[in-house]
């Protein structure tokens, strides 16, 4: 064993050794850099070269590995002795080396999971991609830099003939030898999808796909050339997508809510123009004397939005949002003022919560205040006696039918609304009665004859006259005596030493 490590010659190691394999390190051009012996232990890969220095790769640091008929390659991580890189070795027993490494990884519960590098290929379809595990070192592939700064395919033209711990170019990307045909699963065409160990399931997912997203520029150009009028609808219905480009990944976002509103507004304006051209007599504009550009641009029928008016639901046409008027004006909407029309034309709010009304209550008399009782509004903000059908929110200029006014005025005349009544008045003191307990303090404190409290039946006078009973009597003589006693306490004249313990005067 020791002789093999010190003298790794071809003759010293048999060709059928269990865990030692004769390998030749090659570069990306297929040139041989040096021969050695690859040994697989329980924890790491060890490469012994002729100059007696060994290179170790721990199994936990291997990102992916693969094999060909006469080639074994793997990718190491940044924590390895050699750093990050892809290393390839020619070996006559490459398949045995791969199977043994995979068995060791499975026994040690080491899972190498790497997402495949998906690239576009114009010459070969997805169904022709072989499913054999292989490495990403395809011949002629352009070098790409990783986010951490290390090259994905290092160059080994200036590498020495033996591995070194300081140079990540100990191994090389897997490349075929001179004259070798690219017929093996590992030797695929340029820019081909690369699959590694434990990632064969990705190929099944890719085979199930039927189409590939086209770039955004192509889609927009085709949409403009074919159907320019249908472009807003296609943009509106488009979902966020992720497109894979040769230079990177492109994210295509869907339309924002503001864009959707603008596109819907354009649709409604177009629909209004069609209705005006079809039947112009029905959509008559009202003249209010205001020079409003918004009112002149599009018909007012397609812009009116009313929420919670009289609690009635407005019929809506198919394909249009709730609450929008698209048909001709009916008898109910003809009473609406134009000023309210101009305000609601610019405000298109939906799902607005209905606010409780605020009314100014008239001053109640004493009898009405007693008859109405306490004011307790209900949970929904309306009094029980009020009809919630009559709730006008954000419709200050809307004219309500006269029948509604009659009903509302009759209700307000019968029962004053009590919702949000800010008439805070002090209740009358005439009906109040104060019960108090009178205690005889002059009597003796004899336990045999306890004094029983007396509860008078007559109410207490509203204006008390004997206010002197509420004040305490001050004993002047006792106050002067306590003051003299306080002045007689010893004071510090500055001669005594003060410490932390006797710095304050202690009580006598």
Curated annotation (Swiss-Prot):
Residues recorded with modification Phosphotyrosine: 196, 306, 349, 392, 436, 471
This protein's UniProt keywords: Lipoprotein, Membrane, Myristate, Phosphoprotein, Ubl conjugation
Tissue specificity of this protein: Highly expressed in heart, brain, spleen, lung, liver, skeletal muscle, kidney and testis.
Region named Disordered: 122-180, 200-243, 270-297, 315-338, 366-385, 441-467, 483-508
Domain of life: Eukaryota
CDD domains on file: PTB_FRS2
GO cellular component, as recorded: adherens junction; cell-cell junction; cytoplasm; cytosol; endomembrane system; membrane; plasma membrane
Residues carrying lipid (N-myristoyl glycine): 2
An MF annotation (GO) of this entry: transmembrane receptor protein tyrosine kinase adaptor activity
Composition bias, Polar residues: 276-286, 325-338
Signal peptide range in chain numbering: none
Modified residues (Phosphoserine): 177, 211, 221, 365
Post-translational modification: Phosphorylated by ULK2 in vitro. Phosphorylated on tyrosine residues upon stimulation by NGF or FGF2. Phosphorylated on tyrosine residues by activated ALK and FGFR1. Phosphorylated on tyrosine residues upon activation of FGFR2 and FGFR3. Phosphorylated on threonine residues by MAP kinases; this inhibits tyrosine phosphorylation, and thereby down-regulates FRS2-mediated activation of MAP kinases.
The IRS-type PTB domain, residue ranges: 13-115
Alphabetical GO biological process terms: anterior/posterior axis specification, embryo; cell surface receptor protein tyrosine phosphatase signaling pathway; fibroblast growth factor receptor signaling pathway; forebrain development; G protein-coupled receptor signaling pathway; gastrulation with mouth forming second; lens fiber cell development; lens placode formation involved in camera-type eye formation
Binding partners and assembly: Part of a complex containing FRS2, GRB2, GAB1, PIK3R1 and SOS1. Part of a complex containing GRB2 and CBL. Identified in a complex containing FGFR4, NCAM1, CDH2, PLCG1, FRS2, SRC, SHC1, GAP43 and CTTN. Binds RET. Binds ALK, FGFR1, CKS2, MAPK1/ERK2, MAPK3/ERK1 and SRC. The tyrosine-phosphorylated protein binds the SH2 domains of GRB2 and PTPN11. Interacts with NTRK1, NTRK2 and NTRK3 (phosphorylated upon ligand-binding).
Job of this protein: Adapter protein that links activated FGR and NGF receptors to downstream signaling pathways. Plays an important role in the activation of MAP kinases and in the phosphorylation of PIK3R1, the regulatory subunit of phosphatidylinositol 3-kinase, in response to ligand-mediated activation of FGFR1. Modulates signaling via SHC1 by competing for a common binding site on NTRK1.
Official protein name in the record: Fibroblast growth factor receptor substrate 2
Organism (species): Homo sapiens (Human)
């Amino acid at each position: 064993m020791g002789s093999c490590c010190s003298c790794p010659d071809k003759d010293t190691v048999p060709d059928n050794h269990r865990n030692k394999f004769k390998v030749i390190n090659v570069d990306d051009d297929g040139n041989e850099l040096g021969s050695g012996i690859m040994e697989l232990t329980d924890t790491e890969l060890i490469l012994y070269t002729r100059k007696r220095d060994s290179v170790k790769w721990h199994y936990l640091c291997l990102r992916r590995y693969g094999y060909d008929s006469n080639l074994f390659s793997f990718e190491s991580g940044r924590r390895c002795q050699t750093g990050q890189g892809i290393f390839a070795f020619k070996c006559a027993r490459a398949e045995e080396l791969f199977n043994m490494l995979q068995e060791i990884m499975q026994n040690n519960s080491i899972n190498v999971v790497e997402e495949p590098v998906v690239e576009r290929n114009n010459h070969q379809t997805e169904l022709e991609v072989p499913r054999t595990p292989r490495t990403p070192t395809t011949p002629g592939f352009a070098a790409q830099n990783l986010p951490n700064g290390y090259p994905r395919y290092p160059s080994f033209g200036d590498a020495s003939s033996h591995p070194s711990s300081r140079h990540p170019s100990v191994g090389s990307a897997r490349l075929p030898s001179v004259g070798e045909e690219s017929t093996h699963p590992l030797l695929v065409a340029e820019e081909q999808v690369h699959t590694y160990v434990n990632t064969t399931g990705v190929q099944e997912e890719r085979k199930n796909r039927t189409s590939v997203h086209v770039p955004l520029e192509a889609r927009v150009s085709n949409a403009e050339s074919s159907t320019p009028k249908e472009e807003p609808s296609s943009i509106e219905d488009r979902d966020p997508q992720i497109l894979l480009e040769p230079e990177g990944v492109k994210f295509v976002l869907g339309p924002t809510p503001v864009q959707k509103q603008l596109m819907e507004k354009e649709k409604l304006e177009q629909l209004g123009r069609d209705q005006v051209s079809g039947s112009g007599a029905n959509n008559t504009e009202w003249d209010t004397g205001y020079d409003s550009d918004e009112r002149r641009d599009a018909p007012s029928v397609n812009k009116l939005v009313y929420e919670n008016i009289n609690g009635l639901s407005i019929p809506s046409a198919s394909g249009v949002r709730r609450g929008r008027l698209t048909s001709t004006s009916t008898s109910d909407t003809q009473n609406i003022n134009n000023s309210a029309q101009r305000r609601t034309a610019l405000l298109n709010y939906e799902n607005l919560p209905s606010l409780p009304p605020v009314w100014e209550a008239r001053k109640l008399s004493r009898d009405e205040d007693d008859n109405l009782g306490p004011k307790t509004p209900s949970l929904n903000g309306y009094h029980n006696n009020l009809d919630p059908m009559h709730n006008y929110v954000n419709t200050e200029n809307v004219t309500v039918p006269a029948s509604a006014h009659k009903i509302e005025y009759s209700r307000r005349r019968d029962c004053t609304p009590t919702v949000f009544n800010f008439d805070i008045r002090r209740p009358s003191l005439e009906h109040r009665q104060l019960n108090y307990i009178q205690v005889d303090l002059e009597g003796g404190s004899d336990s045999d004859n306890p004094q029983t409290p007396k509860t008078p039946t007559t109410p207490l006078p509203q204006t008390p006259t004997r206010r002197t009973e509420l004040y305490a009597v001050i004993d002047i003589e006792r106050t002067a005596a306590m003051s003299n006693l306080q002045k007689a306490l010893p004071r510090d004249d500055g001669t005594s030493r003060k410490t932390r313990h006797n710095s304050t005067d202690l009580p006598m």
